[in-house]
Amino acid sequence: MGCSHNCDSCSSHCGGEKSLKVAANPAASVKKVIGVVSGKGGVGKSLLTSMMAVGMTRKGYSCGVLDADITGPSIPKTFGVHGQLEGCEEGILPARSEGGVQMISINLVLPHEDDPVIYRGPIIAETVKQFWSDVVWDDVDFLFVDMPPGTGDVPLTVFQSLPVDGIIVVTSPQDLVSMIVGKAVKMAKMMNIPVLGIVENYSYLACPDCGKHISVFGESHIDEVAAHYELPVLAKLPIDPKLAAAVDAGRIEDAKLPDELSGALKTVEGLL
């Protein structure tokens, strides 16, 4: 029998590595999958993920968030979503925020929101896969995947198992930025995942009296780092106490998003 040139459906295993992609739920519809990653924690990755979903929703797109940070989930609280997930014959139904953002998170499965998730790596990886394969995502234009920091099990699982169309690397203005960005970018390139660009969070604080930009965490090095890796800087986002308060209250959909986010939103919009 001749070769069909479709290695995924072939049982001969003669064409190199077999795809590790996990099939989506047959009843689900997702057009684009965007990963949000960081080389370290504390850079506002989940905040950016939430802002991207809100920003694209305000542009008229249907958005979802897959909270892949299994041991440190924060997406439901940011959107003020509580309670347990529900299911149907086709699979798990994602929760929805007041603004219509669909989401799946381990915190929507736990009996209590403050219960710890004490899973080993393989169980965490399988949970992330199920968030893709078992969930009935309803006509989602952009699915943002909020990943834990680093280059461990979850980013590897997402890159191998989900049809990721690109990632956004989140960092902060510190001297460690080059190494941190480098790890995330190199991992993505090793996995053949497109890097859409870099977002610098907590870039500055605008003085409420005079508007002067105060570099709370030191001078930014993001332009040099981005040039080194030949990547665009999608945004330099300020520290915004009002936005932080909205997140704490679960009201991010009511918050004013920073104007500086427009570049990142435009880049993602261009994928459709």
Summary of predicted features, one role per range:
Residues 1-24:
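Cysteine-cluster motifs in flexible loop/terminal segments that predominantly coordinate metals
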Residues 25-31:
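Phosphate-binding P-loop
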Residues 32-70, 185:
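Walker A/P-loop phosphate-binding motif and the immediately C-terminal alpha-helix
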Residues 63, 68-113, 118, 125:
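Phosphate-binding loop that captures ATP/GTP phosphates
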Residues 104, 128, 147, 160, ...:
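Glycine-rich phosphate-binding loops of nucleotide-dependent enzymes
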Residues 110-158:
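Phosphate-binding/switch loop-helix module in NTP-utilizing enzymes
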Residues 142, 148-245:
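Conserved catalytic-core segment of NTP-binding enzymes
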Residues 247-258:
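C-terminal boundary of histidine-terminating zinc-finger modules
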